[in-house]
Amino acid sequence: MAAAGDLVPLGLARRNFAGRIQRIEVTDLNSSLSPEEIERRLIELGFVEGAEVRVLHEGLFGRDPIAVRINDATVALRRREAMAILVG
């Protein structure tokens, strides 16, 4: 497992970044959804500890949303929600 200092929120990652999910840490994401609901949705999409991720594409305006390859699936995700996914 990566040290805490080595972890970066997926929401800050740039195109072609690759890493492994270390944990989901939902804090204040400025969302209308509760932290529990955001965490549940991320897990349902496959964002679980140990999963390999790669940022494939960034949106044109504000680099949002991002397209992320998670295992064998491609998922579009807002950077705001991706901030809860810590990768290393």
Locate the predicted segments by residue.
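Compact, charge-rich alpha-helical regulatory domains located at protein termini
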Residues: 1-48, 54-60, 64-88
